């Protein structure tokens, strides 16, 4: 089945198109992004159960972006009050106040050109087997409870076994003078984890996740994920400490993805090029890896949780080759940063929610597959480690 596009947004579209036309008389550029996303979050352990109709990506609202004389401003609202004429007048009034404050405080703002607005009409509904808003939550809680109980029996020294999941049916609509874009897709994530002490009393917690562009059917994979926890727990309980030093390592796809995202990906988010906060700008066209290393970034790279059709600035999703056989070719870029740098946007302008500013953010950051088998790679290492699985990886930085 297709993830159905929001009837609410379809009903809102005519008034928003009228709003854009009204504001277009006062500004050099006008667009509006509207979202309507529904879903759930679920957590089940031996001691607690939690079910919520909200998660990090459930939302409903709109944000207007305008440009005049090189200055961009935004106005966000949850519901469209009154007539488009009244809202247009309120937006003009509020944004003029913002500009007055900037003038009074002497804030130096970026002067940016007008965003391109090539004509485009796009409607995308992605495939899913089930919808989060129609999921039988009672049955899902019962299933997770049974899995938690099974985990307690399977995993040695388990003090608890927890399962968490979230699923969201996302609808987004982008309207400008010449563009009318609509998309809907479902993404789902689930994790099972067990907790238990080693002989020194340190808590070890093996975990395994499932995720993808699809509905709650993805959570069916948690049964197999749970079966992997006992072996991992046994290895964690018996693992010794590594003697500090330098070693050759082989990384599994999970660790390789972590390195690609945290150690490299953030450094080529090009809004940081604008602010001179990223070393990546100094390495474009230079060697940053071996001939075997080619890396892609983009929502089109894989049907994962970020496999959208267009980003939050109305730019179509892309597949960017960031590293080509070891040479850094480019980074990723939101639309405004692209204008300031004189490059093309890559479809990576993302908002935490509709009311937040769009930043350059990653989607799928992946290495191309190589030609060598794992056994060959292991045979090439005299002494080292095979790294599998991670517990964290957040690079702390301020946009």
Question: What are the functions of these language-model segments?
Answer:
Residues 1-308, 315-318, 324-327, 385:
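Active-site bordering "gate/hinge" segments
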Residues 283-399:
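Dual-mode signal for accessory low-complexity, basic/Gly-rich regions
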């Amino acid at each position: 089945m297709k993830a159905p596009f929001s009837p609410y947004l379809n009903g809102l579209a005519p008034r928003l198109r009228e709003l854009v036309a009204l504001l277009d008389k006062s500004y050099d550029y006008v667009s509006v992004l509207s979202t309507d996303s529904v879903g759930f979050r679920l957590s089940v352990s031996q001691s607690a159960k939690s079910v919520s109709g909200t998660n990090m990506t459930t939302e409903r609202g709109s944000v207007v972006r305008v440009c005049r004389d090189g200055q961009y401003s935004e106005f966000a609202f949850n519901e469209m009050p009154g007539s488009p004429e009244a809202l247009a007048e309120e937006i003009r009034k509020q944004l003029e106040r913002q500009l007055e404050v900037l003038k009074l405080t002497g804030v130096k703002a970026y002067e940016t050109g007008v965003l391109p607005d090539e004509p485009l009409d796009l409607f995308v509904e992605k495939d899913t087997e089930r919808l989060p808003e129609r999921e039988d939550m009672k049955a899902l809680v019962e299933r997770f409870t049974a899995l938690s109980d099974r985990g307690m029996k399977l995993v040695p020294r388990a003090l608890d076994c927890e399962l968490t999941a979230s699923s969201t049916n996302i609808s987004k609509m982008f309207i400008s003078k010449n563009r009318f874009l609509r998309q809907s897709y479902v993404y789902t994530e689930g994790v099972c984890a067990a907790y238990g002490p080693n002989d020194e009393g340190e808590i070890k917690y093996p975990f395994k996740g499932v995720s993808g562009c699809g509905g709650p059917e993805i959570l069916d994979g948690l049964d197999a994920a749970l079966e992997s926890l006992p072996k991992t727990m046994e290895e964690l309980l018996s693992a010794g400490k590594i003697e500090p030093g330098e070693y050759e390592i082989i990384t599994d796809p999970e660790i390789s993805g972590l390195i690609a995202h945290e150690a490299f990906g953030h450094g080529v988010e090009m809004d940081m090029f604008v602010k001179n906060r990223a070393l990546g700008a100094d390495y474009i066209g230079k060697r940053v890896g071996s001939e075997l290393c080619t890396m892609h970034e983009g929502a089109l790279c894989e049907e994962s949780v970020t496999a959208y059709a267009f980003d939050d600035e109305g730019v179509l999703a892309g597949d960017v080759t960031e590293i080509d056989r070891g040479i850094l070719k480019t980074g990723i870029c939101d639309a405004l940063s692209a204008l300031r740098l004189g490059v093309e946007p890559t479809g990576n302008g993302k908002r935490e929610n509709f009311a937040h500013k769009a930043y350059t953010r990653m989607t799928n950051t992946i290495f191309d597959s190589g030609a060598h088998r794992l056994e060959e790679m292991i045979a090439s290492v005299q002494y080292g480690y095979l790294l599998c699985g991670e517990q964290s990886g957040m690079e702390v930085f301020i946009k």
